[in-house]
Regions:
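Glycine-rich phosphate-binding loop of ATP-dependent small-molecule kinases
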Residues: 1-193
Length: 193
């Protein structure tokens, strides 16, 4: 049975998680799972999950844990069974302690290991500048502040959760895209590559 490696990206909205995950996907031949992209896809396709998630996304709130956990469990299990997948980069999951605990329980059932948790730390001013130019539905100015508040209250506690497990590495996300990538590769050299 093959071992599957997971990298987790944490950081506030606009910190560059998706950008850096895509760069790593190409370099490491990992699969990128963005919970935000999966939710937007379900909303656009008007699936049952999309209908349930839509109001939460539009208000800048987190989608309830049970919906997210079920969605991610199915994707991780599916990818685990694909022979050409050596690793998964999780972007936007977990976002709560409950989701992180569920992920731990899931990977115990499978031959899966979390290799690193990368926190992209970035100043709020830079976040506002970046998000203002993206043009996504959930990047409207009135929602950005709420999304940051939700992040601080519900997702930031994960930093301590993963620090206690000796998995957390914090990267300065205020740097250029290339400098952030280089910092990530330096952290991962000993852990994944």
């Amino acid at each position: 049975m093959k071992s599957l490696e997971i990298l987790i990206f944490l950081g506030p909205p606009g910190s560059g998680k998706g950008t850096q995950a895509e760069i790593l996907t190409d370099k490491l031949n990992f699969t990128h799972l963005s919970i935000g992209d999966l939710l937007r896809e379900n909303i656009i396709n008007n699936t049952d999950l999309g209908k349930l998630a839509s109001n939460f996304v539009k208000s800048g709130e987190l989608v309830p844990d049970e919906l997210i956990i079920d969605l991610m469990d199915s994707y991780i299990t599916e990818l685990k069974n694909e022979s050409n997948v050596s690793g998964i980069i999780l972007d936007g999951f977990p976002r709560t302690i409950n989701q992180a605990t569920s992920l731990e329980n899931k990977i115990k059932q499978l031959n899966v290991v979390i290799k690193a948790v990368l926190n992209l730390d970035i100043e709020d001013k830079e976040i506002l500048n970046r998000l203002a130019g993206r043009g996504r539905e959930d990047d409207k100015p009135e929602l950005i502040k709420n999304r940051l508040k939700v992040y601080r209250n519900q997702t930031e506690p994960l930093l301590e959760f993963y620090k206690e497990r000796s998995l957390l590495d914090t990267i300065n996300g205020d740097q250029s895209e290339t400098d952030v990538s280089n910092a990530i590769f330096n952290v991962l050299k000993a852990e994944v590559v």
